[in-house]
Structure formats: structure tokens, C-alpha cells
């Protein structure tokens, strides 16, 4: 039986439903579902995501042939429901053609409206509606969209504006008007003629007049847009597989531009920036939907309270607001009432915040789509917790509703209050996406990406953003636009990325050609600093320092919920008391990796460290180590104090010694003077330490076994600090970790030094501290012989950075030279240093845990590489039975949520 490729919907019936989003895409599944629950939706049909894959496998002609009969039959069904005919001159049916992947990708793919118009049909539409201006406005919009999306009419240079917009500006200038809606029917006819001439001149193609030719061109263009540059980039950012494909939705047009009783808009059942349980959105009277989301006109608010808040931000009086910018609630009260009832119905049906598009055609409300809304990290947490309290979802759903990586946004910095009080306010726009950002002004997306690569923080300043700006938005610290509302492309995408954004700052005048922006008489050029606050919409001159954000009660409640369900504990990687304090505040239950080498780089300590490394003999080394001991002990004491009552896993010295010595002549001269030796001696010693492959050389336990006096000093520092704190009434829990072992005897030799040193120290101090000695499993041989190692080691900590490096044979420092090619060619799906390789490295971990526990059933196992804060890797660690993961302090909340989700998914 031939598989079904086209699914129809309309008039309260549908062949699809909500749970078919993998096949129909999010939009197609929701259009079907809305029909089934009684929401007014224009009829249409969905071509499945599977066809998208067929399109790229078999080619355009083969797929058009496969679809032809089903599409033509479905069009006839829509004609019957709408009582009109596709391509008919007297009673025309017009359709929209939209993309719809299973995961929301706002603005990344293409849309075409008003399809089916030509020079004859437009006259019939004018007669049918008795509204020539509406008909010709619809036609010029169609030619503009089709020319862009299907025929490839783009600006030639990045400084140029859209070629169609350039023609519109010329016609408006000749007419002496400022706004598009001041153009009359003759002007619109002129635009259509000039648009078609421009298409022929730039593309060499005549604009198609046959309705079905237009339709097939649009369907294929939507499939093609799945592989456009911005869609590919967005998928990489969001982790969306290319094989998912996009569906194509063909739907009868309803018109928001048929006069003053028509409108179009976008609305949200809750606030997408803050999560406040407040219906909100924007609409435009006598407009089409793309006008709202494209940010071409700054729209009005749907609710009265939203309108009043907007007016306050813009400095508009209440009297002026009511007269010029009334809300839909005030201007169209009956439509507003129906819209409010239906948005509540949809949120209650989907049990999640909804992002909805609608059109009002001559007083009748139609819904064009609904989807689970994109939201900021702060909104995500608040909505999950409030829906839990409102009884809409249960605890597990609340946890699964939150994306671990988006928690990172809640930890975003805010402007320093003191510095802010002295800052100069330039203007205020709409607070489209919260956070604080400062950086150098750039005007073009490619420049933002280039400046970011060169180490500059940038703010992307645009008249309005488009999907082509995605790479620049990703590279920027924040985005500032002159046009567009809270539902414009810039706002929606910035919120999805967790980027700070101020939109619709009407007082700014952007000049792309001179690369300047003028704000209330102040001219700023490319490269000047600017600061923006996406939480309240303020724009400031210059660079304002930031400080850490304060976390909400909802965040704390979410974290408590995580701990209720998670089995896997979360520790932190911390080398300073400040790091440890941050991590403890985020809920870390210990330190999983304290790197001792980072403590040696202060001016005084590095001199003593270098003396130890460059010493001629054991006596010289011990003399230098005696200088280092009090420094190390003081450092450990502060960390143990901060983590009082919690385990602190200290890794003995790991890096190759050449990393600590001076390689420049000035540094070598200073070192020679400090040690009372010749510069030649220092240079020769430094050269003798250099290795061809230092990451596999004289480092880790190999240092401790070659120079046991180093291990002895570090053991005295760690346990000496613990003894002093014990006497002061603290409760330290030290763990000493031997790095880079591959052979049991390497561990045994180090353990012997540690235990003998501890016994002497405890006798001297008159106090004994319980402590553990464990090892880092980062050499594949250690994983393969884990049962033998566990006979001595009291715990395992998997160093997944080095374990990945040695398992793949990739140098972590050099992988950047070929990784982009490997990812592009799909040789690798992800960077294995970012996401744990479960099939190779993961198998070594799983094997080592099983072997280790076969000898020592109570063996504690964790990981301490950067993978410890990556959600997919955390879930793998849960699956293989690790006791904890350890990650950098600001990744602790992410790991806690991922651990809870892993337990729920089990």
C-alpha cells in the first residue's frame, strides 16, 4: 500500500492529530488538533516530513510527480469548504504555503502568502471584495514574497536594503508619503509592474502566472529552505537532526488587510520573557501576519494592561495612547473576548504556554497556528512551577518541561547598580529578552561573527533583524533594533537563544552605509561601546560592568524538586574559595576536582615552584617545597572551610613541569638571580624539561613517582590544613586523588607515600582525620584493569577530558584544525570533548565501574571532566550507575536538573 504523504484538515475534521508532530511537523499537527477541538482554522493540508527527505533523496521532479494527484485532490477539498476556486478569475481561492518542522524553528524557513494571484485574478479579487486596494496590496505582497523565497531576489551587497523595499521607498518618495498604507491603488499597481521587471532583470525569469506552477514552486522552495544556511545553523544550535525534515502546510488564505474590521496578530498565553501568567501579544489593523513577525511595522498591544505598559516605556501619555494606539481589548472588544477564551482553551488543552498566530477577516477570528512557545530560562522555570501550583501539570512534568541548558540564562549577569547610576541613558525600547549586555557596535551579522572570533564582545545593531542575521545574533552579546515589537523576529529568536535584546527602539536612526547609529543627537559609530538592558529596555552609552544575577524563589523550588527525584549527586570543579562558594550556593554537595596546580601561579608561589622544578638535587627540591608547603596549606584550609562537612577531592600535581618554568630570557634571568645560578644553567634545565608529546609525557603520577617529595609535600598540605580545621571545630572531608595512572603499581607507590606521610603528620598534630585515597581513571589501560586498581583505590573519578583524548587519539589542543570538517561531513555528530562519546569512552567507563565494584562493592565512582555539566553526558552517567558528576560551578544547576530528568526517564 502506497504510504500517505498528504493529510487534510478543515471544518472541524482532520486526518492528523497532536501526537503526529514527527510526521506532520509541529504546525501541521497543531492545525489538525485545533480543528478537532473546535478552534476556527482555515482549511488546508499538510505534506509530511517524510516527503522532505524523499525530496533530497529523489529530487524535485520525482517528488512533484509523487505528490501531484494528492495535492490537486486536497486543493479541491479546500475549494469546496471555502466555496471558491484556485486560479479562478471571478471567485479566486488564495493559499499560504508555510514550513513546519517537528521542533519550532521561528523564522528559519520560508513562508509565502496570497499564492494564486496573477494579473487577471487580482481584478477578480478586487471585484469580489469590492476592495481594489486590498486586492492589489495582496498581489504586491505575493510578488515580493515569491520573488524573494522562490526566485531568489536578495540584496546584492550587505549594505543594500531588500530590492523590493528599495522600490517601495522610491515610489513613496516620488509620491511624497512616509508610510506604506498611504500608497493608493495606482501606486500598488506600479509596484507590481516594477517588482516583476526587477525579477526579470536580476533572475532572468518571468514571474509565473499559472496558479499550480506557483504552488509547486512554493512547495519546493519550502523543502529547499530546510537546507538553507540559517536553518542549518539553527539546527546545530538547538541540536535538531537534519533527517527530521520539514513538513509543508498549504492553507486557505484569510485576510487581515481587508480594512478597519480586519487585523492580524501574534499572542502568548503567558509572558515569554518573564513567565508572568498574563495573556499578551501584538496586533496590526489592516495588515498581514508577516508584518507583525518581520518587525516591519511596530504593532499595538492586544490587552489594555499590555498597552499601558508599552505606552509607559515609550513615554506616551494615556490620552495619546487611547487615541492613537488603543489595545485590541479596547478597539475590538468582541474579537478580544473570543481570542482570550480560545487562548485559555488552547493552553488548558496543551498544558503548556502557547504562541498563537491569528487573523481577523472582516470581523471573523481565525487561528493560523499554535505551538508551545519559546521562552527565556527565567520564564521556563516560572511557568513550570506556576503550572505545577495551578494543578495543570505534575512534578515530573514540571521537571521534564525545563531544558537543562536554559538554566544557564538565569545565571546571566546584570549591570552593576553603582555603575548604572552613573551611566548615560540614550533611549528606551521594548524589553524583548532579559539580561544585560555591553559590547562594541556592529551593524552586520557577518561582522558580528568575525569580531566575536577575534575576541571582541559585540552588540548587533539593526533596523530590524531577519533570519539571515542568525549567525551574527548568536555571536553577539545582545541585539538592539529600531523596529519590531515583542513578537518580532529579533525578540523571538533572542529569547530562544537566551540573548539580551531591546527591540523597537524608535528613537534610533541606523545608517548602514556610514555604519553609524544616531540616538537623540548622539552619533555612535561601528566599534563604539554600547550597553543594553533587555529586562527594562534601556540603552546606555559606553561600557557598564556587570555583576551576578540573583536567583528567584521559583529557581530554588525547582532545584529542591530536582533533588527529590535525582539519584546522581552533583559536585563541582573548584580551585579557589570563591569558586567553591559559588558552587555551594548552586547546590553542589562537594568538590569532585580541586586542581592543585592552579594554586602555584601567584607571583610568590611561582618563584618557589620554579626553584623546586629547576633544583639540581633532592635537597634543593625539598628546600623549595618547604617554601611551598605553607602556601598550599593555606589554600586548602580556605577551600575546606568553605566546603565544611562536604567531601573535597584534591588531585595531586598533574601538568608537565615545563608549563611552570620561564621560557623567555627575562624570566630566566630573574630565576637565575633568585636561585643564585647562571642563566645558562636555567636555560639548559628548561630545555631538558621540554617534551615532544607532553600530554603523554612526564606528568601526573609519573611526576609523583619520580619526585616522591612532591607528593609528600602536597599530602602534608592537604591533611595539615584538615587537622588545623578539625582543631578549630570544622568538619573537613579530604580525598586525595592520584592522577593519570595506567598500572596498579603506579598507584601503589603513590598510595604508600601518602599513607606514610599521613601517619607521621597525625602523630605530630595529635589528631587523626579520616581521608580517602582514590585515583583518576583517564588512561584506557586503567579502565581495562579497573578490578586490580580497585583492590587499592577507595574511589574512581573518571577524567573524561584525557580519557576522550587517549581513546580517540585526538589532541584536545589540536582538534580544532579538523573538527569543523568532521562535523560538516558527519564523520562526527558532535564534538567528543563537549558531549561524552557513549559508544567508546562510555563503554570504558561502564566496564571500569563494573570491574571496580566486582572487587570493592561500595566503590564510589564519579566523573570530573567538563562532560559533568553536559545534560546528555549526565544522563549517561546516571544510566551506568555513577554516584556523582562534577562540573564547573555555574553548570551545577544544569547537572542537577539533568540528573533528575535521567531518573524520571528511567
Regions found by a protein language model. Name each.
Residues 45, 482-484, 503-506, 594, ...:
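Short beta->alpha connector loops at strand-helix junctions that form conserved
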Residues 249, 442, 459-461, 480, ...:
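Structural motif
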Residues 98-99, 551-554, 561-906:
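Conserved alpha/beta-domain cores
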Residues 364-366, 459, 466-474, 486-493, ...:
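Glycine-rich phosphate/ribose-binding loops and adjacent secondary-structure elements
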Residues 477-483, 501, 862:
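A short, small-residue-rich loop immediately preceding and capping a beta-strand
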Residues 428-468, 519-557:
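Extended, non-globular alpha-helical segments
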Residues 1-423, 431, 450, 456-459, ...:
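Nucleotide/phosphate-binding sheet-loop regions of phosphoryl- and nucleotidyl-transfer enzymes
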Residues 76-88, 517-520, 759-768:
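Short mixed-charge
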Amino acid at each position: 500500500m502506497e504510504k500517505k504523504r498528504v493529510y487534510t484538515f478543515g471544518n472541524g475534521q482532520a486526518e492528523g492529530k497532536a501526537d503526529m508532530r514527527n510526521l506532520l511537523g509541529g504546525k501541521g499537527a497543531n492545525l489538525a488538533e485545533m480543528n478537532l477541538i473546535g478552534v476556527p482554522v482555515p482549511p488546508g493540508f499538510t505534506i509530511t516530513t517524510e516527503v522532505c527527505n524523499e525530496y533530497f533523496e529523489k529530487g524535485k521532479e520525482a517528488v512533484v510527480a509523487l505528490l501531484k494527484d494528492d495535492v490537486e485532490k486536497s486543493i479541491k477539498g479546500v475549494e469546496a469548504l471555502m466555496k471558491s476556486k484556485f486560479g479562478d478569475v471571478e471567485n479566486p481561492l488564495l493559499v499560504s504555503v508555510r514550513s513546519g518542522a517537528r521542533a519550532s524553528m521561528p523564522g528559519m524557513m520560508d513562508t509565502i502568502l496570497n499564492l494564486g494571484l496573477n494579473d487577471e485574478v487580482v481584478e477578480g479579487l478586487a471585484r469580489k471584495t469590492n476592495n481594489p486596494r486590498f486586492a492589489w496590496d495582496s498581489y504586491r505582497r505575493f510578488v515580493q514574497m515569491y520573488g524573494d523565497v522562490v526566485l531568489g531576489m536578495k540584496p546584492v551587497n550587505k549594505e543594500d536594503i531588500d530590492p523590493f523595499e528599495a522600490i517601495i521607498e522610491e515610489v513613496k518618495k516620488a509620491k511624497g508619503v512616509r508610510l506604506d498604507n498611504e500608497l493608493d491603488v495606482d501606486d500598488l499597481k506600479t509596484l507590481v509592474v516594477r517588482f516583476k521587471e526587477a525579477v526579470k532583470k536580476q533572475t532572468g525569469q518571468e514571474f509565473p502566472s499559472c496558479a499550480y506552477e506557483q504552488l509547486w514552486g512554493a512547495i519546493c522552495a519550502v523543502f529547499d529552505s530546510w537546507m538553507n544556511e540559517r536553518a542549518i545553523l539553527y539546527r546545530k544550535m538547538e541540536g535538531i537532526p537534519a533527517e527530521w525534515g520539514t513538513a509543508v502546510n498549504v492553507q486557505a488564505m484569510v485576510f487581515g488587510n481587508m480594512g478597519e474590521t480586519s487585523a492580524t496578530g501574534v499572542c502568548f498565553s503567558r509572558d515569554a520573557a518573564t513567565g508572568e501568567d498574563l495573556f499578551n501579544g501584538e496586533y496590526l489593523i489592516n495588515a498581514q501576519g508577516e508584518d507583525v513577525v518581520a518587525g516591519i511595522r511596530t504593532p499595538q498591544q492586544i490587552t489594555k494592561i499590555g498597552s499601558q505598559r508599552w505606552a509607559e516605556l515609550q513615554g506616551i501619555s494615556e490620552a495619546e495612547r487611547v487615541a492613537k494606539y488603543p489595545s485590541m481589548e479596547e478597539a475590538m472588544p468582541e474579537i478580544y473576548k473570543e481570542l482570550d477564551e480560545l487562548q485559555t482553551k488552547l493552553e488548558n488543552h496543551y498544558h503548556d504556554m502557547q504562541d498563537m498566530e491569528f487573523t481577523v477577516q472582516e470581523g471573523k477570528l481565525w487561528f493560523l497556528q499554535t505551538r508551545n512557545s519559546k521562552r527565556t530560562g527565567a520564564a521556563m522555570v516560572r511557568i513550570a512551577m506556576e503550572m505545577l501550583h495551578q494543578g495543570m501539570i505534575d512534578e515530573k512534568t514540571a521537571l521534564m518541561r525545563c531544558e537543562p541548558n536554559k538554566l544557564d540564562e538565569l545565571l546571566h549577569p546584570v549591570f552593576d547598580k553603582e555603575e548604572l547610576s552613573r551611566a548615560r541613558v540614550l533611549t528606551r525600547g521594548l524589553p524583548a529578552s532579559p539580561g544585560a549586555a555591553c559590547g562594541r557596535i556592529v551593524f552586520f551579522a557577518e561582522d558580528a561573527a568575525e569580531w566575536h572570533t577575534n575576541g571582541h564582545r559585540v552588540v548587533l545593531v539593526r533596523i530590524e533583524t531577519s533570519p539571515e542575521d542568525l549567525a551574527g545574533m548568536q555571536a553577539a552579546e545582545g541585539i538592539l533594533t529600531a523596529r519590531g515589537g515583542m513578537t518580532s523576529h529579533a525578540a523571538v529568536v533572542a529569547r530562544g537563544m537566551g540573548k539580551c535584546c531591546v527591540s523597537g527602539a524608535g528613537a534610533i536612526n541606523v545608517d548602514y552605509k556610514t555604519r553609524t547609529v544616531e540616538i537623540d543627537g548622539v552619533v555612535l559609530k561601528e566599534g563604539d561601546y554600547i550597553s543594553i538592558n533587555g529586562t527594562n529596555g534601556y540603552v546606555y552609552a559606553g561600557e557598564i560592568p556587570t555583576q551576578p544575577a540573583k536567583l528567584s524563589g521559583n529557581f530554588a523550588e525547582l532545584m529542591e524538586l530536582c533533588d527529590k527525584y535525582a539519584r546522581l549527586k552533583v559536585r563541582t570543579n573548584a580551585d579557589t574559595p570563591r569558586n567553591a562558594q559559588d558552587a555551594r550556593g548552586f547546590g553542589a554537595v562537594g568538590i569532585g576536582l580541586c586542581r592543585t596546580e592552579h594554586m602555584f601561579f601567584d607571583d610568590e608561589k611561582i618563584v618557589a615552584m620554579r626553584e623546586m622544578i629547576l633544583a639540581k638535587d633532592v635537597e634543593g627540591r625539598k628546600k623549595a617545597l618547604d617554601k611551598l608547603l605553607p602556601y598550599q596549606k593555606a589554600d586548602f584550609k580556605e577551600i575546606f572551610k568553605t566546603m565544611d562537612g562536604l567531601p573535597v577531592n584534591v588531585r595531586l600535581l598533574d601538568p608537565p613541569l615545563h608549563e611552570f618554568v620561564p621560557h623567555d630570557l627575562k624570566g630566566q634571568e630573574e630565576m637565575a638571580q633568585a636561585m643564585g645560578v647562571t642563566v645558562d644553567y636555567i636555560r639548559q634545565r628548561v630545555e631538558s624539561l621540554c617534551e615532544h608529546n607532553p600530554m603523554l609525557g612526564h606528568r601526573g603520577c609519573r611526576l609523583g613517582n619520580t619526585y616522591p617529595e612532591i607528593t609528600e609535600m602536597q599530602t602534608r598540605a592537604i591533611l595539615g590544613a584538615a587537622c588545623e580545621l578539625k582543631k578549630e571545630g570544622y568538619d573537613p572531608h579530604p580525598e586525595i586523588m592520584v592522577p593519570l595512572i595506567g598500572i596498579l603499581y603506579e598507584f601503589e607507590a603513590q598510595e604508600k607515600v601518602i599513607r606514610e606521610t599521613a601517619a607521621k603528620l597525625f602523630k605530630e598534630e595529635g589528631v587523626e582525620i579520616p581521608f580517602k585515597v582514590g585515583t583518576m581513571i583517564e588512561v584506557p589501560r586503567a579502565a581495562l584493569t579497573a578490578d586490580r586498581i580497585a583492590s587499592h583505590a577507595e574511589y574512581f573519578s573518571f577524567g573524561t577530558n584525557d580519557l576522550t583524548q587517549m581513546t580517540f587519539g585526538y589532541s584536545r589542543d589540536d582538534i580544532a584544525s579538523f573538527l569543523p570538517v568532521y562535523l560538516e561531513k558527519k564523520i562526527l555528530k558532535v564534538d567528543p570533548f563537549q558531549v561524552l562519546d557513549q559508544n567508546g569512552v562510555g563503554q570504558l567507563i561502564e566496564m571500569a565501574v563494573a570491574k571496580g565494584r566486582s572487587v570493592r562493592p561500595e566503590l564510589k565512582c564519579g566523573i570530573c571532566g567538563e562532560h559533568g555539566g553536559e545534560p546528555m553526558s549526565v544522563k549517561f552517567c546516571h544510566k551506568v550507575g555513577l554516584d556523582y558528576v562534577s562540573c564547573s560551578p555555574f553548570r551545577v544547576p544544569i547537572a542537577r536538573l539533568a540528573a533528575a530528568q535521567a531518573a524520571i526517564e528511567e
